[in-house]
Amino acid sequence: MDHKKTSIRTTALAALVLGAVAAPAFSAPVDQATYNGFKIYKQQRCETCHGATGEGSAAFPNLLNSLKNLSKDQFKEVVLKGRNAMPPFEANKKVAEGIDDLYTYIKGRSDGTVPAGELEKPQ
């Protein structure tokens, strides 16, 4: 039996277990509307253009900044009707029916009340 390999495996396993226990949670509890909006953002792949946290890219708008200037009605019009490179989503049932929740999530990110990262499903 190779004690050196066994010792390394044991140490690696212990580090893995302790790391998992000591690792901070990367999710935050939120209300149902915010959680629904978060799920729509992820499932409808908004992050493809606007980034995982809504901060955009060189080619696509930073939604966090945009929501500092757009009203809820203006946001809904842009998402549902489209604008410039933004395609319209009014034919997308999930987006159209969940537009208020999507706004709630992105507005919360914009205002700093909703953290970046995964969100916990409300109890």
Curated annotation (Swiss-Prot):
What does the PTM comment state?
Answer: Binds 1 heme c group covalently per subunit.
Q: Which residues cross the membrane?
A: none
- Residues reported in the UniProt entry to bind heme c: 46, 49-50, 86
Domain of life, source organism = Bacteria
Q: Which InterPro entries does the entry link to? A: Cyt_c-like_dom (IPR009056), Cyt_c-like_dom_sf (IPR036909), Cytochrome_c550/c551-like (IPR051811)
Signal sequence interval, chain numbering = 1-27
Q: Which GO terms describe its molecular function?
A: electron transfer activity; heme binding; metal ion binding
Q: Name one Pfam family in it.
A: Cytochrome_CBB3
Question: Per UniProt, which keywords does this protein have?
Answer: Electron transport, Heme, Iron, Metal-binding, Signal, Transport
**Gene3D superfamilies given in the database record:** Cytochrome c-like domain
The molecule here is called: Cytochrome c-555
